[in-house]
Amino acid sequence: RRTAIELGADNAPYVVGAADQGGYADVISPPSSRPLQNGDVLMLDTGCVWDGYFCDFDRNWAIGQADELACRAYDVLWRATQAGIDAARPGATCRDLYVAMSTVIAEIDDSGGEIGRLGHGLGMQLTEQPSHAIFDTTVLKENMVLTIEPSLSYGNGKMMVHEENIVVSEGQARLLTERAQPELPMI
């Protein structure tokens, strides 16, 4: 939070996260006195405000090392995020973004995912319409600000989520966040 404000954010109202061996079971977990351990996957989600506008993003890290399944889940999630970014063009629909991401997610998570969303609008509120969901046929327009936020389930009750912020533009969506590394970072 302090770093975000030092780098120019007016406010960083929250930092939430989760961590456990090989992955986490919930995106927003209550605080725990359990120390991080070798093999944990840590996710932090934060939002900042600048001049009244929100950003909303998260990142994942492995503590020490990651098991093969967590690395595979991260790879699928990174590629699903890229599919969402690539699909975000004027004239596409939120459903198109959802389908692009869920097609990649299905490589590891065959739960179907017909409930929920894989991103949302972003602006003067942290979460705005539209929703990247199977039911949302909102047509994307140039200069819309969106999150690309795929999530997936894997292993025995584990999940992983990733989030980037973009501006819809002709040709290619423009990232507002620094794109996460293509491989699960180890710290």
Locations of regions flagged by a protein language model:
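Active-site neighborhoods and metal-handling regions in enzymes and metal-associated proteins
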Residues: 1-187
